[in-house]
Amino acid sequence: MRKNEYSDYRSVIADSWNRCIAWGLDHDHEPAPLRPEPARLEEINRQHSELLSVTEAEVLPYYRNVLSNSRCLILLADQHATVLSSWGDERITETRLKPWFQTGANWQEQNCGTNAIDTSIAVGGPVQIQRNEHFLKTNRSIIGSAAPIFDAHRQIAGVLSVFSDAYLPQAHTLGMVRLLSQSVENRLINRQFGPDHFQITLNTTADNFDSPWSGILVCDDSGQVIASNQRADQLLGMNTVE
């Protein structure tokens, strides 16, 4: 990690802790998971049905091929930090934390302190929260990595995260969750616009066009860019959709 990246990383943690202090949280606070009523949870899942199906299509093959022997759990949460689904090893943590990894659990910082899911939402980018970087002591046995999933309108549609209580290579874990979230974002764009629009694929080398890290521009019949993924903005150094 380069010096400026480390400085930014430390700032993310410090800013989150300051928010927790402002909300009146204490390090010894042990919150109960906040869950929506069953009818409300059903409505939330219905609203995010496409996100759920797309994420499952991307995550399950990757988990089976790469992570099936790892002690980790993959969570999909909505834009308000409510868990929509999970995949992986449910034995990753002690019994008292298991309710937090179940559908409907809400990870908002205001209730459960610094954590990968809602801190990622707060900063609008990927984060990794190591054990003692969690504001609440109750969460310090786990490591979380998370990255937001953006829709075609630059809004956060959800958050993909990986939690573990084992010493996995953390740089690899954060890179993996970023890759998966980008894959989901790309597939959401493809589903939304489909064959009725023109798609331009960008990358730094010609042999990487099929990579999830490719930039995607979607154009209408007049050639106007109407949608793009985050990677396209990074490659072009500009907001491609105004």
Residue ranges of predicted features:
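Short, glycine-/Ser/Thr-/acidic-enriched flexible segments
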Residues: 134, 223-224, 232
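Intrinsically disordered, low-complexity terminal regulatory regions
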Residues: 1-108, 118-128, 141, 150-222, ...
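Terminal output helix/cap of sensory domains in signal transduction proteins
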Residues: 117-118, 242
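PAS/PAS-like sensory domain cap-loop motif
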Residues: 89-92, 96, 233-241
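Helix-to-coil/beta transition segments that act as allosteric "coupling" elements at the rims
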Residues: 133-151
